[in-house]
Amino acid sequence: MSEDDLPDGCDYLIEDAVEALDNLDEEPVAIFLDDAWARPQRAQQFGVEYDTHPFDESQSGLRDHIDTSITTTEIIDKCYEVLADGGWLIADADDWLLPRLITYLQEQWGDVASSYNGGGYRKVGGVTYLSSDGNPDKSTAGMYLSTGGYPVVFAHKGETDRQSSVSARQVADRVREQYGWGSVKPISPYEEWVKGLVSPGELIAVPCAGTAPAALAAERMFGDEAQYVCIDVESDAKTAFKQRRANEINSYKQETID
Protein backbone atom coordinates (compact mmCIF):
# COMPACT_ATOMS: atom_id res chain seq x y z
CA MET A 1 0.00 0.00 0.00
CA SER A 2 1.10 3.58 -0.70
CA GLU A 3 0.91 6.33 1.90
CA ASP A 4 -2.51 7.15 0.42
CA ASP A 5 -3.72 3.59 1.10
CA LEU A 6 -3.77 2.86 -2.62
CA PRO A 7 -2.60 -0.54 -3.88
CA ASP A 8 0.97 -0.96 -5.07
CA GLY A 9 1.30 0.32 -8.61
CA CYS A 10 -1.50 2.86 -8.14
CA ASP A 11 -1.15 6.58 -7.42
CA TYR A 12 -3.03 9.88 -7.41
CA LEU A 13 -0.84 12.93 -8.06
CA ILE A 14 -1.75 16.55 -7.39
CA GLU A 15 0.25 18.07 -10.23
CA ASP A 16 0.00 19.78 -13.57
CA ALA A 17 -1.17 17.19 -16.11
CA VAL A 18 1.51 17.88 -18.72
CA GLU A 19 4.37 17.83 -16.20
CA ALA A 20 3.10 14.70 -14.46
CA LEU A 21 2.66 12.82 -17.73
CA ASP A 22 6.16 13.86 -18.74
CA ASN A 23 7.57 12.37 -15.53
CA LEU A 24 5.94 8.95 -15.76
CA ASP A 25 8.40 6.10 -15.27
CA GLU A 26 6.51 3.83 -17.64
CA GLU A 27 4.58 4.27 -20.88
CA PRO A 28 0.84 3.90 -20.32
CA VAL A 29 -1.01 1.64 -22.73
CA ALA A 30 -4.14 3.76 -22.40
CA ILE A 31 -4.89 7.31 -21.31
CA PHE A 32 -8.37 8.21 -20.11
CA LEU A 33 -8.76 11.99 -20.39
CA ASP A 34 -11.67 14.06 -19.12
CA ASP A 35 -10.64 17.64 -19.85
CA ALA A 36 -13.67 19.30 -18.26
CA TRP A 37 -11.75 22.58 -18.15
CA ALA A 38 -11.80 22.85 -21.96
CA ARG A 39 -14.94 25.01 -21.99
CA PRO A 40 -13.49 28.52 -21.93
CA GLN A 41 -16.65 30.55 -22.45
CA ARG A 42 -18.55 28.63 -19.77
CA ALA A 43 -16.28 29.71 -16.91
CA GLN A 44 -18.38 30.75 -13.91
CA GLN A 45 -21.57 30.03 -15.89
CA PHE A 46 -24.03 27.16 -16.27
CA GLY A 47 -22.81 25.50 -13.09
CA VAL A 48 -19.14 25.68 -14.14
CA GLU A 49 -17.66 27.18 -10.98
CA TYR A 50 -14.00 26.58 -11.83
CA ASP A 51 -11.54 28.33 -14.13
CA THR A 52 -11.35 26.93 -17.64
CA HIS A 53 -8.69 27.01 -20.36
CA PRO A 54 -8.61 27.46 -24.15
CA PHE A 55 -8.52 24.63 -26.63
CA ASP A 56 -5.43 26.07 -28.30
CA GLU A 57 -3.34 29.24 -28.34
CA SER A 58 -5.23 30.74 -31.27
CA GLN A 59 -8.48 31.09 -29.37
CA SER A 60 -9.44 34.74 -28.82
CA GLY A 61 -12.21 36.75 -27.21
CA LEU A 62 -11.81 34.97 -23.89
CA ARG A 63 -13.62 36.04 -20.74
CA ASP A 64 -12.31 36.24 -17.18
CA HIS A 65 -11.61 33.10 -15.13
CA ILE A 66 -9.78 31.50 -18.05
CA ASP A 67 -6.31 30.07 -17.46
CA THR A 68 -4.22 30.67 -20.57
CA SER A 69 -1.12 28.96 -19.16
CA ILE A 70 -2.28 25.62 -20.56
CA THR A 71 -4.40 24.44 -23.48
CA THR A 72 -6.18 21.24 -24.39
CA THR A 73 -3.87 20.71 -27.36
CA GLU A 74 -0.84 20.77 -25.05
CA ILE A 75 -2.37 17.96 -23.02
CA ILE A 76 -3.27 15.99 -26.16
CA ASP A 77 0.26 16.41 -27.54
CA LYS A 78 1.76 15.14 -24.30
CA CYS A 79 -0.62 12.18 -24.29
CA TYR A 80 0.66 11.19 -27.72
CA GLU A 81 4.27 11.61 -26.64
CA VAL A 82 4.03 9.37 -23.57
CA LEU A 83 1.62 6.71 -24.84
CA ALA A 84 3.05 3.32 -25.68
CA ASP A 85 3.05 2.50 -29.39
CA GLY A 86 -0.41 1.23 -30.24
CA GLY A 87 -1.79 2.72 -27.03
CA TRP A 88 -5.26 4.24 -26.87
CA LEU A 89 -6.58 7.67 -25.93
CA ILE A 90 -10.13 7.58 -24.60
CA ALA A 91 -11.27 11.18 -24.18
CA ASP A 92 -14.56 12.36 -22.72
CA ALA A 93 -15.97 15.35 -24.56
CA ASP A 94 -19.00 17.60 -24.85
CA ASP A 95 -20.76 19.41 -27.68
CA TRP A 96 -18.19 22.21 -27.72
CA LEU A 97 -15.07 20.09 -27.41
CA LEU A 98 -16.09 17.20 -29.67
CA PRO A 99 -15.61 18.73 -33.17
CA ARG A 100 -12.42 20.53 -32.18
CA LEU A 101 -10.93 17.41 -30.61
CA ILE A 102 -11.76 15.20 -33.59
CA THR A 103 -10.31 17.69 -36.07
CA TYR A 104 -7.13 18.07 -34.05
CA LEU A 105 -6.65 14.32 -33.72
CA GLN A 106 -7.24 13.83 -37.45
CA GLU A 107 -4.67 16.48 -38.30
CA GLN A 108 -2.02 15.59 -35.72
CA TRP A 109 -2.42 11.87 -34.97
CA GLY A 110 -3.91 10.67 -38.25
CA ASP A 111 -7.36 9.68 -39.46
CA VAL A 112 -7.46 5.90 -39.35
CA ALA A 113 -11.26 6.00 -39.51
CA SER A 114 -10.84 7.29 -43.06
CA SER A 115 -7.64 5.62 -44.24
CA TYR A 116 -7.87 2.29 -42.35
CA ASN A 117 -4.07 2.49 -42.09
CA GLY A 118 -1.82 3.55 -39.23
CA GLY A 119 -3.32 5.30 -36.27
CA GLY A 120 -5.06 8.42 -35.12
CA TYR A 121 -8.73 9.22 -34.72
CA ARG A 122 -10.74 6.00 -34.72
CA LYS A 123 -14.28 6.46 -33.47
CA VAL A 124 -16.84 8.44 -31.48
CA GLY A 125 -18.67 6.57 -28.77
CA GLY A 126 -20.34 7.83 -25.68
CA VAL A 127 -22.30 7.23 -22.52
CA THR A 128 -26.09 7.50 -22.40
CA TYR A 129 -27.60 7.93 -18.98
CA LEU A 130 -30.64 5.86 -18.08
CA SER A 131 -33.52 7.04 -15.93
CA SER A 132 -35.12 4.87 -13.26
CA ASP A 133 -37.56 3.35 -15.80
CA GLY A 134 -34.69 2.20 -18.03
CA ASN A 135 -35.27 4.78 -20.76
CA PRO A 136 -32.70 7.38 -21.85
CA ASP A 137 -32.46 10.15 -19.29
CA LYS A 138 -34.04 13.49 -20.22
CA SER A 139 -33.22 15.46 -17.10
CA THR A 140 -30.11 17.22 -18.44
CA ALA A 141 -30.70 20.96 -18.34
CA GLY A 142 -30.78 22.82 -21.62
CA MET A 143 -33.07 24.98 -23.74
CA TYR A 144 -31.97 23.46 -27.04
CA LEU A 145 -32.53 19.72 -26.61
CA SER A 146 -31.17 17.67 -23.72
CA THR A 147 -27.96 15.68 -23.91
CA GLY A 148 -28.63 12.77 -21.59
CA GLY A 149 -24.99 11.74 -21.46
CA TYR A 150 -21.72 12.67 -23.16
CA PRO A 151 -19.63 11.70 -26.21
CA VAL A 152 -16.32 9.86 -25.91
CA VAL A 153 -13.58 10.00 -28.55
CA PHE A 154 -11.29 7.04 -29.26
CA ALA A 155 -7.88 7.32 -30.94
CA HIS A 156 -4.67 5.29 -30.92
CA LYS A 157 -0.98 6.01 -31.42
CA GLY A 158 0.07 4.44 -34.69
CA GLU A 159 -1.02 0.97 -35.69
CA THR A 160 -2.37 -1.12 -32.85
CA ASP A 161 -2.86 -4.76 -31.99
CA ARG A 162 -5.18 -3.74 -29.16
CA GLN A 163 -8.48 -4.69 -30.71
CA SER A 164 -11.83 -5.31 -29.10
CA SER A 165 -15.48 -5.78 -30.05
CA VAL A 166 -16.59 -3.93 -26.90
CA SER A 167 -19.09 -1.23 -27.82
CA ALA A 168 -17.82 2.34 -27.93
CA ARG A 169 -21.33 3.34 -26.88
CA GLN A 170 -22.41 2.43 -23.37
CA VAL A 171 -25.46 3.02 -21.19
CA ALA A 172 -25.27 3.63 -17.45
CA ASP A 173 -27.27 4.91 -14.53
CA ARG A 174 -26.55 8.49 -13.57
CA VAL A 175 -24.32 8.68 -10.46
CA ARG A 176 -26.24 10.27 -7.59
CA GLU A 177 -23.50 10.43 -4.96
CA GLN A 178 -21.20 13.35 -5.76
CA TYR A 179 -18.56 12.88 -3.02
CA GLY A 180 -18.24 16.64 -2.76
CA TRP A 181 -17.19 16.85 -6.42
CA GLY A 182 -19.19 18.63 -9.10
CA SER A 183 -19.36 15.95 -11.79
CA VAL A 184 -19.07 12.23 -11.08
CA LYS A 185 -19.28 9.86 -14.03
CA PRO A 186 -20.27 6.17 -13.90
CA ILE A 187 -17.69 3.41 -13.65
CA SER A 188 -19.37 0.70 -15.73
CA PRO A 189 -18.62 2.13 -19.22
CA TYR A 190 -14.93 2.39 -18.36
CA GLU A 191 -14.96 -1.18 -17.09
CA GLU A 192 -15.91 -2.28 -20.59
CA TRP A 193 -13.25 -0.15 -22.28
CA VAL A 194 -10.54 -1.13 -19.79
CA LYS A 195 -11.45 -4.79 -20.19
CA GLY A 196 -11.36 -4.48 -23.99
CA LEU A 197 -8.12 -2.53 -24.42
CA VAL A 198 -5.95 -3.15 -21.35
CA SER A 199 -4.49 -6.28 -19.76
CA PRO A 200 -3.83 -6.89 -16.05
CA GLY A 201 -0.54 -5.35 -14.94
CA GLU A 202 -0.50 -2.71 -17.69
CA LEU A 203 -0.40 0.97 -16.77
CA ILE A 204 -3.20 3.41 -17.53
CA ALA A 205 -2.95 7.17 -16.96
CA VAL A 206 -5.89 9.34 -15.98
CA PRO A 207 -5.05 13.06 -16.33
CA CYS A 208 -7.65 15.63 -15.23
CA ALA A 209 -8.88 12.74 -13.14
CA GLY A 210 -11.56 14.04 -10.81
CA THR A 211 -13.04 10.92 -9.21
CA ALA A 212 -11.32 8.83 -11.90
CA PRO A 213 -13.90 6.24 -12.97
CA ALA A 214 -11.38 4.62 -15.33
CA ALA A 215 -8.94 3.99 -12.47
CA LEU A 216 -11.69 2.49 -10.33
CA ALA A 217 -12.77 0.40 -13.31
CA ALA A 218 -9.24 -1.00 -13.61
CA GLU A 219 -9.20 -1.83 -9.92
CA ARG A 220 -12.55 -3.60 -10.22
CA MET A 221 -11.46 -5.55 -13.27
CA PHE A 222 -7.91 -6.43 -12.27
CA GLY A 223 -7.82 -6.26 -8.47
CA ASP A 224 -4.24 -6.31 -7.18
CA GLU A 225 -2.94 -6.30 -10.77
CA ALA A 226 -4.42 -2.87 -11.51
CA GLN A 227 -1.84 -0.23 -12.42
CA TYR A 228 -2.90 3.40 -12.71
CA VAL A 229 -1.70 6.97 -12.22
CA CYS A 230 -4.38 9.62 -11.69
CA ILE A 231 -3.47 13.29 -12.07
CA ASP A 232 -5.35 16.42 -11.04
CA VAL A 233 -4.39 19.92 -9.93
CA GLU A 234 -7.17 20.07 -7.33
CA SER A 235 -6.54 18.46 -3.95
CA ASP A 236 -10.32 18.26 -3.48
CA ALA A 237 -10.42 15.92 -6.48
CA LYS A 238 -8.13 13.48 -4.73
CA THR A 239 -10.22 13.67 -1.57
CA ALA A 240 -13.35 12.93 -3.59
CA PHE A 241 -11.60 10.05 -5.36
CA LYS A 242 -10.53 8.47 -2.08
CA GLN A 243 -14.08 8.73 -0.73
CA ARG A 244 -15.50 7.24 -3.89
CA ARG A 245 -12.93 4.47 -3.98
CA ALA A 246 -13.64 3.50 -0.36
CA ASN A 247 -17.32 3.23 -1.20
CA GLU A 248 -17.23 1.73 -4.69
CA ILE A 249 -14.41 -0.76 -4.34
CA ASN A 250 -15.59 -2.07 -0.98
CA SER A 251 -19.15 -2.41 -2.31
CA TYR A 252 -17.90 -4.20 -5.41
CA LYS A 253 -15.81 -6.62 -3.36
CA GLN A 254 -18.81 -7.39 -1.17
CA GLU A 255 -20.99 -8.01 -4.22
CA THR A 256 -18.47 -10.49 -5.65
CA ILE A 257 -18.32 -12.30 -2.31
CA ASP A 258 -22.10 -12.50 -2.06
Task: Show the residue positions of the predicted features.
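Haloarchaeal acidic low-complexity proteome signature biased toward cell-envelope/secretome components but also
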Residues: M1-D8, N247-D258
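Core catalytic lobe of class I
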Residues: S2-I231
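The DNA-recognition helices of helix-turn-helix-type DNA-binding domains
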Residues: M221, R245-E248
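Conserved SAM/SAH-binding beta-strand->alpha-helix loop
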Residues: E234
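Conserved SAM-binding loop
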Residues: F241-K242
